[in-house]
């Protein structure tokens, strides 16, 4: 099974922080959520996913399937529920719940349209602390993600975008 969070966990383990606070935009089937929480005992994680039907790069994702994903995700992370909060909403509606420069990392793996990835970058980048990790998934495999991330990076003068073997893109703020 492929879990996109493997590359992210390796990066976060390099920090010397006693406590980590982060956001996962797009929790999906919960594999990455579980991996983050089980691998990083010092992590408080906020998940943002509306679990509603939508069309994306991989076709139609019916609401019934996503409702099943929600149930599975919550069952998987039950042992870690004291360190996890799920906002069942779209990322645009949740961004104001977080103070600027309050988070150690953000992992963007939600709606993969060019417009939404760019908007998530613009909305959530200010939430990262200086020295925090700004990251996401599907940089090499989905053109819309690649274009949006590259455009945003250029806009804020990020000259190098790091990548892991698990197709996680990142840079340090």
Locate predicted features:
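S-adenosylmethionine/decaboxylated-SAM
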Residues: 6-173
